[in-house]
């Protein structure tokens, strides 16, 4: 990734921040985006940051222009869509309209709008890698809320469609599907909105794959970040339209 220009959403914490650190260590120039402030732990001159809401309709244009201004180049070698929010385990019976709308907007619509803007650049340069962070729940349906599951299934579909549609333009599009990971999503959940009946039914399964029995707990963000880095780089040059689970074997059951 030496000399590459990479855009990372959700860059202030969790998997996004872990990915930023890997990219910078490999010599990439990274344009980070997040609703939260710039991560104070990142001090590299190769890291530039834009704080905004990716759901704003003008956000994609601002992000692409911001990267161009920051690094003095029209190139975008990789787009890593890491940002995401949860839905409090609300089911098809209990979901609230505002929660549904927010989750679909952040986890799907905003990601696809940014892809559209970045694809304009990648199509001209005839190269580029897009990595979308979906979830173990993109590979199944249980153990999550209906909006979150729907958004991640849809984003995986977008990933596969984009991979095929733009393969002849030198553009790859792949996905990483993390399992239970210790990220900021868990720390910012509004407990008053949780569907505790659904949550209670899911916990026995979630607990096994969070390693609660061993006391090890959730995975750190680094394993998912390493998979994202791999798919963004030329190490995965022959891979297009794939999804890599990083979930302690959860997706095999």
Curated annotation (Swiss-Prot):
Signal peptide: none
Keyword Plastid (UniProt): no
Catalytic site: 148, 152
Transmembrane portions of the chain: 5-25
GO BP, one annotated term: terpenoid biosynthetic process
Entry's EC annotation: 1.1.1.-
PROSITE patterns: ADH_SHORT (PS00061)
Location, primary (coarse class): membrane
Membrane topology: Single-pass membrane protein
Location of the protein in the cell: Membrane
CDD domains: SDR_c
Binding site for NADP(+): 8, 116, 148, 152, 184
Keyword Metal-binding carried by entry: no
GO molecular function: oxidoreductase activity
Pathway terms, separated by semicolons: Secondary metabolite biosynthesis; terpenoid biosynthesis
GO cellular component, one term: membrane
InterPro entries (alphabetical): NAD(P)-bd_dom_sf, Sc_DH/Rdtase_CS, SDR_fam
Function: Short chain dehydrogenase; part of the gene cluster that mediates the biosynthesis of pleuromutilin, a tricyclic diterpene showing antibacterial properties. The geranylgeranyl diphosphate (GGPP) synthase ple4 catalyzes the first step in pleuromutilin biosynthesis. GGPP is then substrate of the premutilin synthase (PS) ple3 to yield premutilin. Premutilin synthase is a bifunctional enzyme composed of the fusion of a class II diterpene cyclase (DTC) and a class I diterpene synthase (DTS), with the corresponding domains and active sites containing characteristic aspartate-rich motifs.
This protein's name: Short chain dehydrogenase ple7
């Amino acid at each position: 990734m030496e000399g590459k220009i990479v855009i990372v959403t959700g860059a202030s914490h969790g998997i996004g921040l872990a990915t930023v650190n890997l990219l910078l260590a490999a010599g990439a120039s990274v344009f980070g985006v997040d609703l939260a402030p710039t991560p104070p732990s990142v001090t590299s001159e190769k890291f530039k940051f834009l704080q905004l809401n990716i759901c704003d309709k003008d956000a994609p244009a601002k992000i692409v222009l911001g990267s161009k201004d920051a690094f003095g180049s029209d190139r975008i070698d990789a787009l890593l869509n890491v940002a995401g929010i949860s839905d409090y385990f609300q089911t098809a019976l209990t979901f609230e309209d505002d929660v549904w709308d927010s989750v679909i907007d952040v986890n799907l619509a905003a990601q696809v709008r940014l892809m559209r803007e970045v694809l304009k650049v990648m199509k001209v340069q005839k190269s580029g890698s897009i990595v979308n962070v979906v979830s173990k729940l993109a590979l199944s349906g249980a153990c999550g809320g209906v909006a979150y599951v729907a958004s991640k299934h849809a984003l995986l579909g977008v990933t596969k469609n984009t991979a095929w549609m733009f393969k002849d333009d030198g553009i790859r599009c792949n996905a990483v599907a993390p399992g239970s990971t210790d990220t900021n999503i868990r720390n910012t959940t509004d407990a008053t909105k949780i569907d505790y009946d659904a949550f209670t039914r899911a916990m026995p399964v979630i607990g096994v794959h969070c390693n609660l029995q061993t006391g090890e707990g959730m995975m750190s963000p680094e394993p998912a970040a390493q998979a994202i880095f791999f798919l963004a780089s030329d190490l995965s040059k022959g891979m297009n339209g794939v999804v890599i689970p990083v979930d302690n074997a959860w997706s095999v059951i």
